[in-house]
Structures are given as structure tokens and as C-alpha cells.
Amino acid sequence: MSGFQAQLILLSLVSYVIGSIPFGLLLTAVAGGGDIRKIGSGNIGATNVLRTGRRGLAAATLLLDALKGALAVLIARFFFPGASETTMAVAAVAVVIGHCFPVWLGFRGGKGVATGLGTIWVLCWPVGLACCVVWLLVARLSRISSAGALAAFLLAPGLMVLLSGRPLHTPIPVATLLISLLIWARHSSNIARLVTGREPRVKVDQASRR
């Protein structure tokens, strides 16, 4: 094993651990909201935290989940020996895997949307901005958060190629594609409900009044 390969393994582990911090679970518990895994969909992400009726708590979860994605890529970019697009791509994928499959929760985590967006903001901020706009616009119009997330990550790989000028086969577009595929896979049950018209809508206005 080469030194660079060993560094990539270490970076993957560091990024995975960062991603596996379950902010939704921790914040809800500290705020006296109980175990978020026993509320709503049982997911630890911001959308399910919003179902507790605590809009500020959901916003904090969204922000912190995004920041851990950004942090992993920033570590790979500025603090890791031999920093390159490859190290940034590895960190981006590993931190999203950590969020989706945290060892502390029996590998049952979130769906990776906020963390994925956090990585993309650092990899190429115009793509991150475009994905956020798509997500928020579709979610606002449909009142279905999963629809916004799926739309954003359907477009993310193509946007990365177009806006960053990188060929599809290079590390950062490949990482964006892998993250998008993982997020779509994590939304398989949502997709099934969207097809049948049974996907629940997020009652943002009701939540904001609590």
C-alpha cells in the first residue's frame, strides 16, 4: 500500500466519522423533543425534525448537517497532505456515507441531502447554489421536501460538469454522481410514495406557529 493510498483511507475514516454525527437526533433530545427516530418518518434529518413542530430546531439540523459535509471537504482541501481533487472527492463521498450509515445508530441514518449539498458548496459553489435553488423551489411549490431533494440531485451531476468545466470522468463530477445516486437510493420509499401520490406534505406553516 502506497503512502497516498494510506492517506485516502485515513481521510475516508475521518470524513465518515464527521458525517456520522447525528445532529438531528442530538438536538431534538437536548431540546426535550424525545427520540426523533420515534417521530414521524423516523429519519434523523431536518425534514423529520420539522415534523416535531420546532422550525428553529429543524433549521439548526439542516445547517449543521450541511456544515459537516463542507467541513470534511475543507479538511481534505486545506489540511490533508497531498491535497487534490481526488482527496476532496473521497472526503465528499465518505462524509455522505457517514451521514446515511452512522455506526453509532446501527447504520440507520439520514438520507444525505443537506450533507450532500454541503459538500457540493465547497466542491463548486455555483453548483451548490443552483442545487439549493432547485431544492427550495420544488419543495416550496409541491410542499414535498423529497421532491425538491430528488430534483436537485437529479440535476447535480450535469450541473457540476457544465458549471465547473470538469469532464464527467474526473474525480469531482464522479463524486457528485455517486452522492446523487446514493441520495436517490436512500429515497426509494419516497419515490414509491410519490408515484402513488401518498408522499406526505410538510406543513411548514403549521410548524412555524408552534
Swiss-Prot record:
The chain crosses the membrane at residues 8-28, 56-76, 87-107, 119-139, 144-164, 165-185. GO terms for cellular component: plasma membrane. Pfam families: G3P_acyltransf. Keywords: Cell inner membrane, Cell membrane, Lipid biosynthesis, Lipid metabolism, Membrane, Phospholipid biosynthesis, Phospholipid metabolism, Transferase, Transmembrane, Transmembrane helix. One of its GO terms (molecular function) is acyl-phosphate glycerol-3-phosphate acyltransferase activity. Its EC number is 2.3.1.275. One of its GO terms (biological process) is phospholipid biosynthetic process. Pathway: Lipid metabolism; phospholipid metabolism. It is a multi-pass membrane protein. It is found in: Cell inner membrane. It catalyses: an acyl phosphate + sn-glycerol 3-phosphate = a 1-acyl-sn-glycero-3-phosphate + phosphate. Catalyzes the transfer of an acyl group from acyl-phosphate (acyl-PO(4)) to glycerol-3-phosphate (G3P) to form lysophosphatidic acid (LPA). This enzyme utilizes acyl-phosphate as fatty acyl donor, but not acyl-CoA or acyl-ACP. HAMAP family: PlsY. NCBIfam families: glycerol-3-phosphate 1-O-acyltransferase PlsY. Probably interacts with PlsX. Belongs to the PlsY family. This is Glycerol-3-phosphate acyltransferase. The lineage of its organism: Bacteria, Pseudomonadati, Pseudomonadota, Alphaproteobacteria, Acetobacterales. The gene is plsY.
